[in-house]
Amino acid sequence: MAGGFGTAAHAGQSQPAPTSAAKRPIRILMGGYGPATTGFSLALKRMGDRLEAQFGDLVDVKYVYNILDLGYRADDILWLVEDGVLTLGYQSSSYLTDRIPDVGVVDLPFIFPDTATARAAMDGALGRALTTRIEAQTNYRITGYFENGFRHVSNHVRPIHTPADMKGMTIRVLPSKVQARTFELVGATPKIMDLSEALEAIKAGRIDAQENPFANTVTYGVHAFHRFHSMTNHFYISRPIFVHRPSFDAWPTGLQEALREAVRDAVAFQRDLHIKEEEEAMATIKKQGGEIVELTRDELKAFVAAVNPIYGEARGQFSRDLLALLNL
């Protein structure tokens, strides 16, 4: 049986009969910018299913898995949630860096040695510090962080083993000055583009390269146009899960707590699925004739050395407390 919105429902205590006003379901519209089969979309559905199982007809959960299908840009999800058109959505944190520059600290290259370290940071003090800053300057409640994961460079020109191989290449990057600067330091020409614009440019051959987790590269069909894929692991990016603040704050406490619990569960689910998606994407790339370049230790060191100036620049850009959390 579905529980009521009160916190007592979680303890199995009976609830008073709802009034006629309480019988009107709370509408929750979740949205994203990927096919319904992606881990992000499946995680949204998992959240919604959990809420519906708990609250029954007290909630009305609907989904718009891919706003691109409706003619929107990927970055439109920011205002769609902030204005309350969508109740909940996700987007790469890089899209917030113009409004909240401190968020760009997690765009710095090579700051996490592995996935476990990155997850611990985003679930811990670093994630809490970013949440505080985002909520202070937006109309969101941040409820968690999906894993977009480590990113790799793909291109249609040549295999990339060293920074010298990137010299002169045009590469699409997320809307982040830190990311753009990173690729300038390795000799490439970064182009900040929204996803829809970038996909058009890639298909037309107007840009040489892009960077994404392998799963995204395959989801968006980029592997059909890019033969070469280098495992650079240069950025680790998260996707904040944000909720329209006025809606969330107006909800009964029980529903607020239930959503946060549903997000925690969905994040764990999505992260586990992400590992599988990366493995499957690599297999797809190889099966369709793509080449995956695994960098040697020395080749990776060359990239780290090339971008080293960015850490000194970061000390003049970002708050000291954030840098300290990254040991910078």
Pin down the residues of each PLM region.
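N-terminal secretory/targeting leader peptides
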Residues: 3-6, 10-116, 135-136, 140-328
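A gly/proline- and charged-residue-enriched helix-loop-helix capping module
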Residues: 113-134
